[in-house]
Amino acid sequence: MKKQMVSLLLILSLILTLGLSACSKAAEEAQPAETEPVSLEPVIADYLAAEVGKDYDKADACIPTVYVVGTEEAENGDVTVYGDFWVENFDLKDDTLECVSGGHYPGVMQLKKDGDTYSVAKFDVPEDGAKFDESAKKLFGKYYDAWQKYSSDDAARKKQRTKAIADYVKANDLDVTQYQDYGWDPVTLPTK
């Protein structure tokens, strides 16, 4: 009888333990998920197309390429973004986007938080000419080496550019399979 009582108590303890652990897992699963971080790249791309792109002759498409090398968030939620940015304009010829103009804009953007959204409040770029390196070092600070590494890596820049163009083509449902720079062979866009 004593063995049966001990066995019964062990079984009840096991059932109680399993029941409580199942409840705690259900309670954990019921917790609200953390808020997904807001992607800053679309905010930056929209700014580049609207504000920097307007300085170029009109074309069929203005496609920014955004590469973020570092970010810093202030206590008020504003974000400083250090990056390598390109703005390029393309004309559509059959299934090809032909690059007709554009420019390189490495720099630092100040993004102001307003509720759940951001807007670009300020955009600083290095000085042109002989003071470029000196002003880029000052502007990028601790992110200078990361920016320099990316900006001198042709393969990485081409990969980022191709992705930006492919994303634009997909988002705008264009019948485009490639892009081309003047005097160069076309580059086939990924289909995924």
Where are these regions (language model features)?
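Short, non-transmembrane alpha-helical segments in secretory-pathway proteins
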Residues: 34-62
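Low-complexity, intrinsically disordered terminal/linker segments enriched in charged
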Residues: 121-192
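Bacterial N-terminal signal peptides that target proteins for export
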Residues: 1-9
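Mature extracytoplasmic domains of secretory-pathway proteins
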Residues: 65-130
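Bacterial signal peptide processing site
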Residues: 24-26
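Repetitive helical segments and hydrophobic/amphipathic motifs
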Residues: 12-13
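C-terminal motif of bacterial Sec signal peptides marking the signal peptidase cleavage site
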Residues: 18-22
